[in-house]
């Protein structure tokens, strides 16, 4: 009784949560009755703690409504349901079964097949330097790292495919390699293939030229895990999309892991067939956002430590407050500072950094101003620039204004009173409220989260 109600509870959670929240936290759960206790199994401690903190009250309330005093006790545990019976898992009716165009062998993850010679060097494409241990985690990438870690521990499981999207230089490629390293560590003979999407296209073209398309198909459909970076470069390449469509179906039928990255949300990728974009969303889709200030500082401190440099805290904060677009830009700036310090023998101070990064800092300050933010946000939401400064409080105007205030705090060095002055002489408390409101909405609303990320990318590019 309780186990069947658990499936109904899952259905309610699916209705109440966003697709990403459901896929991330609820779908991996399994449940089994032990006496008068319903044991809910989570794949790892991170998922367990999150579900218990965020969703325990909803689960308890559901069982109390359905069973009253007979509601079972709940217990959380890490692992898989031990029973040999079919698992009661939150995966039903989530993903359609792919229809393969023809019969395809379905090797299990534990039994990789012999590797054709077509691309035998792909195994070396997993970079051993990219690990989870040296990936700096923050709010901007926390979900992405958690999902990637889960995939590395349980490839071909609940998060398949895993789709990571976000701007350039935010750590998507790092996570792909970290997953590959995790899989190979747990199973050294696993066939894990990482590549840029253009390499897939090149391999297919070469196979066509050499009359080796069947070997190409056999290779890609036999791998244990396929990671493709920048899938948006498949745009308008019809033959490549056709071949990848069938490869995708074959791998998913065999429970082999697929991870894809892009600079855009799947449905926003132009030039890619709808049937592919639909499949990209079958598993879990996670945004990797530009790092917030604390994460940027942590990245700089980690990079300096790896380089054997003692970076003063105030210098790290100075750089992090001024360079905000992506991790690659941060690391490049720090490398320049370190190189200048080594060449000149001078200590790394704020004044030294101002001098070493003079052109970069000047360009950044020129590009991102409150006026530029206001114009960009007004254009994005299709409102008049005058509305940004007006007293109008309708949501269609107030929300973009709050967004612009939050972005001004994030992307400029202006104080709250200075930002308020730029928005029609508003008080600094109004700006603070706007920043907190947008931060809250980014947690609750997928649309607001997307808008914020899109605007950050536009303003930082």
Curated annotation (Swiss-Prot):
Could you say which protein family the record assigns here?
Belongs to the DnaA family.
Region entry Domain I, interacts with DnaA modulators, spans:
1-87
One Pfam family this chain carries? Bac_DnaA
Which cellular component terms (GO) are annotated to the entry? cytoplasm; plasma membrane
| Positions of the UniProt region annotated as Domain II | 87-124
- Annotated CDD domains: AAA, Bac_DnaA_C
- Annotated region described as Domain IV, binds dsDNA, given as residue ranges: 342-461
Q: What does this protein do?
A: Plays an essential role in the initiation and regulation of chromosomal replication. ATP-DnaA binds to the origin of replication (oriC) to initiate formation of the DNA replication initiation complex once per cell cycle. Binds the DnaA box (a 9 base pair repeat at the origin) and separates the double-stranded (ds)DNA. Forms a right-handed helical filament on oriC DNA; dsDNA binds to the exterior of the filament while single-stranded (ss)DNA is stabiized in the filament's interior.
SUPFAM superfamilies assigned: P-loop containing nucleoside triphosphate hydrolases (SSF52540), TrpR-like (SSF48295)
Q: Which NCBIfam families match?
A: DnaA
Q: How does it assemble?
A: Oligomerizes as a right-handed, spiral filament on DNA at oriC.
Q: Where in the cell is it found?
A: Cytoplasm
**Which PROSITE patterns does this chain map to?**
DNAA
- UniProt note: domains: Domain I is involved in oligomerization and binding regulators, domain II is flexibile and of varying length in different bacteria, domain III forms the AAA+ region, while domain IV binds dsDNA.
- Report keywords, A-Z: ATP-binding, Cytoplasm, DNA replication, DNA-binding, Lipid-binding, Nucleotide-binding
Query: Which is an annotated GO molecular function term of this record?
Result: ATP hydrolysis activity
Q: What residue range is the signal peptide? A: none
Q: Which domain of life is it from?
A: Bacteria
Which protein is depicted? Answer: Chromosomal replication initiator protein DnaA
Query: Tell me, which GO biological process terms does this entry list?
Result: DNA replication initiation; regulation of DNA replication
Protein residues bound to ATP: 169, 171-173
Stretches for region Domain III, AAA+ region: 125-341
Xref: InterPro entries: AAA+_ATPase (IPR003593), Chromosome_initiator_DnaA (IPR001957), Chromosome_initiator_DnaA-like (IPR020591), Chromosome_initiator_DnaA_CS (IPR018312), DnaA_C (IPR013159), DnaA_dom (IPR013317), DnaA_N_dom (IPR024633), DnaA_N_sf (IPR038454)
């Amino acid at each position: 009784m309780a186990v069947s109600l658990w499936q109904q509870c899952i259905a309610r959670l699916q209705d109440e949560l966003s697709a990403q929240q459901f896929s991330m936290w609820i779908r991996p759960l399994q449940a089994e009755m032990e006496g008068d206790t319903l044991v809910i199994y989570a794949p790892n401690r991170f998922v367990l703690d999150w579900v218990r903190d965020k969703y325990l009250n909803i689960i308890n309330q559901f069982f109390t409504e359905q069973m009253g005093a007979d509601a079972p006790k709940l217990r959380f545990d890490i692992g898989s349901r031990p029973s040999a019976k079919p698992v009661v898992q939150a995966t039903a009716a989530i993903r359609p079964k792919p229809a393969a165009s023809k019969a395809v062998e379905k090797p299990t993850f534990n039994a990789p097949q012999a590797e054709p010679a077509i691309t035998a060097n792909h195994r070396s494409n997993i970079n051993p330097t990219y690990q989870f241990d040296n990936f700096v985690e923050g709010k901007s990438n926390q979900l992405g790292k958690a999902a990637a870690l889960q995939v590395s521990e349980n490839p071909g499981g609940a998060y398949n495919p895993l789709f990571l999207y976000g701007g350039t230089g935010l750590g998507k490629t790092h996570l792909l390699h970290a997953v590959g390293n995790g899989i190979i560590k747990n199973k050294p003979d696993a066939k894990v293939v990482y590549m840029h999407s253009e390499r897939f296209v090149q391999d297919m073209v070469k196979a066509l030229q050499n009359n080796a398309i069947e070997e190409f198909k056999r290779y890609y459909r036999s791998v244990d895990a396929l990671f493709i970076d920048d899938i948006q470069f498949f745009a308008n390449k019809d033959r490549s999309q056709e071949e990848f469509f069938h490869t995708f179906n074959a791998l998913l039928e065999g429970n082999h892991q697929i991870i894809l990255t892009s600079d855009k949300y799947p449905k926003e990728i132009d030039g890619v067939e709808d049937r592919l974009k639909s499949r990209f969303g079958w598993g879990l889709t996670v945004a990797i956002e530009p790092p917030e200030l604390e994460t940027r500082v942590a990245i700089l401190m980690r990079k300096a430590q790896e380089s054997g440099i003692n970076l003063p805290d105030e210098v790290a904060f100075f750089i992090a407050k001024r360079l905000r677009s992506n991790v690659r830009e941060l690391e490049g700036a720090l490398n320049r500072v370190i190189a200048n310090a080594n060449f000149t023998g001078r200590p790394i101070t704020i004044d030294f950094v101002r001098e070493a990064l003079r052109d970069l800092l000047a360009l950044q300050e020129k590009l991102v101003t409150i006026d530029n933010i206001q114009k960009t946000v007004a254009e994005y939401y299709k409102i008049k620039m005058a509305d940004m400064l007006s007293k109008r409080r309708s949501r269609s105007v107030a929300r973009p204004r709050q967004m612009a205030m939050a972005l001004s705090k994030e992307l400029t060095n202006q104080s709250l009173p200075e930002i308020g002055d730029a928005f029609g002489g508003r008080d600094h408390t109004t700006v603070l409220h706007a920043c907190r409101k947008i931060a809250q909405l980014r947690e609750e609303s997928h649309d607001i989260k997307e808008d914020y990320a899109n605007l950050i990318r536009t303003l930082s590019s």
